[in-house]
């Protein structure tokens, strides 16, 4: 999608309140990708993305900015926590697995696009598979009259299948099953091994299962995709997308920084994780299920609160790989008020729509919204600052009784006013000890 930086920021304004500096920097970084692709191949190789370091408390919009943009522009995107990785030689996930995760995200993205383009062919394949079970093909040598009867019965059955009239009927189908897909107890570091065995086919077998037709339609989608879609071209496109459009969002980067003033209490493997991360951010070749993936042009966005450490506590080489830095603003009561009212699918709209399913019309008057924002802001100031996430806790507590008794208000309109907010939350916010547990 070809959008100018101004258009990108305008799109983000519908979902993320404030944070103009962060939006501007990311918009420019994404536009530079488009600009790079317009150049000669020789020059493209020399232009590497300027990685971004976002500094700010939790809940201020760091992840949301990157996630929204990636989804809107159709870019492969993954979010990982730096603190979940371990140095090579230690038990746990190694940093290369984040690149394999990005490859999987790109593969799923391209597969879904191709499935949508070939939806009619896939639906027809699934229909024919199910119809074969419902009405087995006639043997050879059958009279023309019998063949015509069979054809008519088949079309009637096809119509019923498409209309959903047979959804509750049960059939037995044969589907492929991989032993790794069905074992939830495998450790995450087995990811590479899973990729290998899937490629060579070890551990895969056909199993027969009885299920309702509506479930069989979903179960046969993968098989339909494997048969109809060109798997090699999908892998090739996914590799290209991951290399040139991929975004890896590394959260909690501050958790692997080694504070100089408190070095004796640090985990010695933290610096090791940084050093393992360095070649990936600099550019290296990683083996994945879709081929060898070059990380040179992946955009890395690192983020952290940096309450107990500073960006300068990261190793110098890694600092140099994140040249663009932006500090995100904390959210005051005015910003929280805008978060409750401005976004397309604001939190208040979500709650109203949820209760609408109970035939209850829920409204918030303006003074009530301002009071909710003030209480959330005060809770953030007096306790740990968790940004906009505090609004979820405050509104859940405010609407707890109404949600529980929603059926009693069916067919009615319920207006939340300032008085109700004060009655439900006033005593809690005044009692600091109680507020720490509830809000």
Swiss-Prot record:
Broad class of where this protein is predominantly found: cytoplasm
Taxonomic superkingdom: Bacteria
UniProt KW keywords: ATP-binding, Chaperone, Cytoplasm, Nucleotide-binding, Stress response
Molecular function per GO: ATP binding; ATP hydrolysis activity; peptidase activity; proteasome-activating activity
Binding site for ATP: 17, 59-64, 251, 317, 389
Short name of one Pfam family: AAA_2
An annotated GO cellular component: HslUV protease complex
The keyword Nucleotide-binding is annotated on this UniProt entry: yes
InterPro entries: AAA+_ATPase, ATP-dep_Clp_protease_ClpX, ATPase_AAA_core, Clp_ATPase_C, HslU, P-loop_NTPase
SMART domains: AAA (SM00382), ClpB_D2-small (SM01086)
GO biological process: protein unfolding; proteolysis involved in protein catabolic process
Function according to Swiss-Prot or TrEMBL: ATPase subunit of a proteasome-like degradation complex; this subunit has chaperone activity. The binding of ATP and its subsequent hydrolysis by HslU are essential for unfolding of protein substrates subsequently hydrolyzed by HslV. HslU recognizes the N-terminal part of its protein substrates and unfolds these before they are guided to HslV for hydrolysis.
Subunit structure: A double ring-shaped homohexamer of HslV is capped on each side by a ring-shaped HslU homohexamer. The assembly of the HslU/HslV complex is dependent on binding of ATP.
Protein name per its UniProtKB record: ATP-dependent protease ATPase subunit HslU
Species assigned in the record: Campylobacter jejuni subsp. jejuni serotype O:6 (strain 81116 / NCTC 11828)
Lineage: Bacteria, Pseudomonadati, Campylobacterota, Epsilonproteobacteria, Campylobacterales
Gene: hslU
């Amino acid at each position: 999608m070809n959008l100018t930086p101004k258009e990108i920021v305008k799109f983000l304004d519908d979902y993320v309140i404030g944070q103009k500096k962060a939006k501007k920097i990311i918009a420019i970084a994404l536009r530079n990708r488009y600009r790079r692709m317009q150049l000669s191949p020789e020059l493209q190789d020399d232009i590497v993305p300027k990685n971004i370091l976002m500094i700010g408390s939790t809940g201020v919009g760091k992840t949301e900015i990157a996630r929204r943009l990636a989804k809107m522009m159709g870019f492969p995107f993954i979010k990982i926590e730096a603190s979940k990785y371990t140095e090579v030689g230690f038990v746990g996930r190694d940093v290369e697995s984040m690149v394999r995760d990005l490859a999987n995200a790109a593969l799923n993205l391209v597969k879904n696009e191709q499935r949508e383009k070939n939806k009619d062919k896939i639906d027809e394949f699934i229909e024919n598979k199910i119809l074969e079970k419902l009405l087995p093909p006639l043997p050879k040598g059958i009279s023309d009259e019998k063949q015509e009867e069979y054809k008519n019965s088949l079309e009637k059955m096809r119509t019923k299948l498409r209309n959903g009239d047979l959804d509750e009927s049960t059939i037995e189908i044969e589907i492929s099953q991989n032993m790794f897909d069905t074992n939830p107890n495998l450790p995450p570091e087995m990811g590479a091994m899973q990729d290998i065995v899937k490629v060579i086919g070890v551990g895969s077998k056909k199993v027969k299962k009885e299920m309702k037709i509506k479930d069989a339609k979903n179960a046969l989608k993968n098989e339909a995709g494997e048969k109809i879609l060109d798997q090699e071209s999908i892998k090739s496109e996914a590799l290209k997308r991951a290399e040139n459009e991929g975004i890896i969002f590394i959260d909690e980067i501050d958790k692997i920084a080694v504070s100089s003033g408190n070095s004796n209490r640090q985990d010695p493997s933290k610096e090791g994780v940084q050093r393992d991360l360095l070649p990936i951010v600099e550019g290296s070749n990683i083996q994945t299920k879709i081929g060898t993936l070059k990380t040179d042009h992946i955009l890395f966005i690192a983020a952290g609160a940096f309450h107990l450490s500073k960006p300068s506590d990261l190793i110098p080489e890694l600092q140099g790989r994140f040249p663009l830095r932006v500090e995100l603003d904390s959210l005051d009561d005015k910003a929280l008020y805008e978060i409750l009212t401005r976004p397309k699918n604001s939190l208040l709209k979500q709650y109203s729509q949820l209760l609408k399913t109970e035939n209850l019309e829920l409204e918030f008057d303006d003074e009530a919204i301002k009071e909710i924002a003030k209480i959330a802001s005060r809770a953030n100031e007096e306790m740990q600052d968790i940004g906009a996430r505090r609004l979820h806790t405050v509104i859940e507590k405010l609407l707890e009784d109404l949600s529980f008794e929603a059926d009693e208000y069916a067919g009615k309109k319920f207006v939340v006013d300032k008085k109700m907010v004060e009655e439900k939350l006033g005593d809690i916010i005044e009692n600091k000890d109680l507020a720490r547990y509830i809000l």
